[in-house]
């Protein structure tokens, strides 16, 4: 009985310690934003599964594209374009029930992403915390470039 009691207390202590050590999502650090994007002015927003007007695109992805475009237009630091050839950067989004994704690519190089952030409910209409993280990173790079 004493052994069971000791194991139970140890388990409770471990759970309490791990719960207190978990990062607070509201204070998580914004990933480093590449300095090569400091001069970007034009942005094209799309989904990994297709463009905004693709009839086969999931409704959630289409809504995420609209939410990101609206947030960027309200922010006013970048100009939305509707053709990838006119963009300096391309933002690709995916919205799923488990997690949303926002990634930034160089529009002129077809390579891996330059910056990426993920989170649950990060690209919902009216509230886009992933775009807020993008804005903070972008402003930080512009501030450092001066």
Stretches found by the model and what they are:
Residues 7-16:
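Bacterial N-terminal signal peptides
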């Amino acid at each position: 009985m004493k052994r069971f009691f000791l194991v139970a207390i140890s388990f409770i202590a471990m759970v309490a310690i791990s719960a207190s050590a978990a990062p607070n999502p509201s204070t998580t650090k914004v990933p480093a934003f590449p300095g090569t994007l400091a001069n970007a002015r034009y942005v094209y927003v799309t989904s990994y599964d297709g463009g905004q007007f693709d009839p086969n695109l999931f409704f959630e992805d289409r809504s995420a594209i609209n939410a990101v475009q609206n947030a960027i237009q309200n922010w006013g630091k970048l100009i939305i374009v509707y053709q990838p050839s006119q963009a300096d950067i391309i933002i690709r989004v995916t919205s799923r029930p488990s997690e949303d994704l926002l990634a930034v690519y160089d529009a002129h190089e077809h390579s891996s992403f330059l910056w990426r952030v993920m989170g649950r409910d990060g690209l919902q209409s009216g509230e886009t915390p992933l775009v807020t993280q993008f804005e903070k990173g972008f402003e930080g790079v512009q501030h450092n470039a001066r």
